[in-house]
Amino acid sequence: MRTLQNLSDIERRLVAELRRRIDTEFTDIEFRMTVFGSRARGDADPDSDMDVLIEVDVEHISFADKRRLRRIATDVSMASGIIVSLLVVDQGILAERGDFSVFENVREEGIAV
């Protein structure tokens, strides 16, 4: 199983800052955060983005909240120089629709944050 130690120093700092910012702004919402894609696999190019899945209970998050999440991701991207591609999904989607290729990738290569 891959862990945060598989990421580079800058990637770990990016993920830590993203998590810290989300935790700070969303104290009342529980969520899971997973890094997946080329950066999680360790085969990223210098220009590769960082794919991040956020699983939340959609009953507790509004469209405005999703916009705030994307703004945080943009801020962290600008500060780090690595583009964060954020995917916000309902917490049950992996179990229900796990056969979608993106969710297969999350299960196979994901790094929980």
For each predicted feature, which ranges?
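Short beta-strand->loop micro-motif that forms the acidic, two-metal-ion catalytic signature
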Residues: D51-E55
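Catalytic core of pol beta-like nucleotidyltransferases
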Residues: M1-R32, A40-P46, D57-V113
